[in-house]
Regions:
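Short linear capping/connector segments at secondary-structure termini
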Residues: 8-13, 324-328
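C-terminal substrate/ligand-recognition segments
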Residues: 187, 191-314
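Flexible glycine/proline-enriched surface loops and loop-helix/loop-strand junctions
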Residues: 38-39, 61, 270-274
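An aromatic- and glycine-enriched ligand-binding surface/loop that stacks and positions planar moieties
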Residues: 31, 45, 49, 54-232
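Extended, hydrophobic/aromatic-rich amphipathic alpha-helical segments that build helical scaffolds
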Residues: 1-6, 19-37, 44-82, 113, ...
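A conserved hydrophobic secondary-structure block that centers on an alpha-helix together
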Residues: 12, 40-41
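Long, intrinsically disordered, low-complexity segments
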Residues: 25, 98-168, 272-285, 296, ...
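Acidic/His metal-coordination segments adjacent to aromatic residues that form catalytic metal sites
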Residues: 10-20, 266-274
Length: 401
């Protein structure tokens, strides 16, 4: 919103402050509380590193929101976090570690701030419901039905060809050698798993083994009622034949099997008391590495940026493949476009993408599947109608509204 009132007394009705005034207020509040907080207490609570990380976010995005570069301050705060000034953290050697934190007593040292989840007490039900099909309960071993609402934007058109949009194709932006680019499956009785995506033909959970799948296919309930449920990396009315394809590929023309499903935050077997028991990370040390890398990249230190990115990325590749994908070993690959792609890969599903694209001038201006460049600036939310009615001192400050 940018232009919001700064209210410190609930009885006050105040007009909007400038973006710079809002920024300065937020910064001063965070800096004031920082030394009074404990260290390494980031399970459902903000500690010193959590507040320092919010300051990193504030400084990293300052130039876009207030027109004043704060990359030097961002670099200093990020480096202090990496140096352990605000607590001891480290990159998890296992790519799944930050997202299964809380399972069987495990706590990932990468997570600076995570929201603890526990079934029947504090659940992330919306996160499951948004991505999961009604029938996924039979493959994932739980009794939830899901809304079948969300999926990855498609990488392929109606005829299986890759789209060419720079900012699209989230699944295919992962190299085939990246070990995250696998179909999700539980691989042990302890809830170990692999892969970040539900894709292709879906099979029933193997209750006899306690993990994995049987050979029994799960069937659809709508367009593919009684037929195998096969997730495709496309959007279109395929069930209607040529008539359906003629409608094109748009948001309104999805089917029940449309799109690969992100399962980065794993839904583990309910029969093992693991379902809805893993935390949801809000801030990972990886974000601090990437923020510091971006500061160095913007200042011209590409090698320094590459080393920081590689420190996180190395866990995604087998040793024999790493030299081909290391930025330090292939520095010419680290361009603006590649940096934006890498942010998308690392933080897919973690609610970073919009603000990252805005910071890199690719949100309103950018194009991807079913989204053309916007004629008006969509970077800033409009002041809500209800807020305008409730406070006569507020003005609509967002252009185009």
């Amino acid at each position: 919103f940018r232009h919001v009132p700064i209210v410190t007394d609930i009885e006050e009705v105040k007009a909007q402050s400038t973006p710079l005034e809002v920024f300065n207020f937020m910064e001063s509040e965070l800096l004031a509380i920082l030394p009074d907080l404990p260290k390494n207490r980031g399970v459902s609570r903000f500690d010193q590193a959590g507040v320092a990380s919010i300051l990193v976010r504030l400084y990293l995005n300052a130039e876009k929101w207030i027109g004043i570069s704060k990359y030097e301050e961002c670099e200093q705060m990020a480096q202090a976090i990496l140096d352990g000034k605000y607590g001891e953290y480290s990159i998890d050697p296992d790519y799944r570690g930050p997202f299964r934190s809380g399972i069987n007593g495990y706590r990932s040292k990468e997570n600076i701030m995570e929201f603890a989840i526990k079934k029947n007490y504090f659940e992330a039900s919306w996160l499951y419901n948004m991505w999961m099909h009604y029938q996924d309960r039979y493959s994932l071993d739980n009794d939830w039905q899901g809304w079948n609402g969300g999926n990855l934007a498609p990488s392929r058109d109606l005829y299986g060809n890759l789209y060419q949009d720079k900012l699209g194709m989230p699944f295919e932006k992962f190299p085939d050698e990246d070990i995250r680019k696998k179909a999700f499956r539980v691989i042990s009785n302890d809830g170990d798993y692999e892969g970040f995506f539900l894709m292709g033909t879906q099979y029933k959970f193997d209750y006899e083994k306690g993990y994995g799948f049987t050979d029994e296919v799960i069937t659809g309930t709508e367009e593919y009622n009684g037929k195998p449920l096969v997730y495709v990396d496309q959007v279109g009315r395929f069930s209607e034949g040529e008539t359906g394809l003629a409608k094109g590929s748009h948001v309104i023309y999805g089917e029940e099997n449309t799109g690969y499903r992100l399962i980065k935050f794993p839904w583990l077997p309910q029969s093992k008391d693991l379902f809805q028991m893993n935390s949801i990370p809000e801030i990972r040390l990886a974000e601090i590495y990437y923020s510091l890398a971006e500061c160095k990249y913007r200042s011209g230190d590409k090698i320094g940026a590459a080393r920081l990115l590689d420190a996180v990325r190395k866990r995604y590749y087998k040793a024999e493949d790493w030299s081909k994908f290391s930025y330090e070993s292939n520095i010419s690959k680290l361009t603006d476009d590649e940096f934006v792609d890498e942010l998308g890969r690392e933080f897919i599903g973690e609610r970073h993408r919009r603000i990252d694209l805005i910071r890199w001038n690719r949100f309103s201006e950018g194009a991807w599947w079913d989204k053309t460049p916007d004629a008006t600036n969509q970077d800033v939310f409009p002041i809500p109608y209800r807020a305008l009615n409730a406070n006569p001192l507020l003005k609509q400050t967002t252009a185009g509204f």
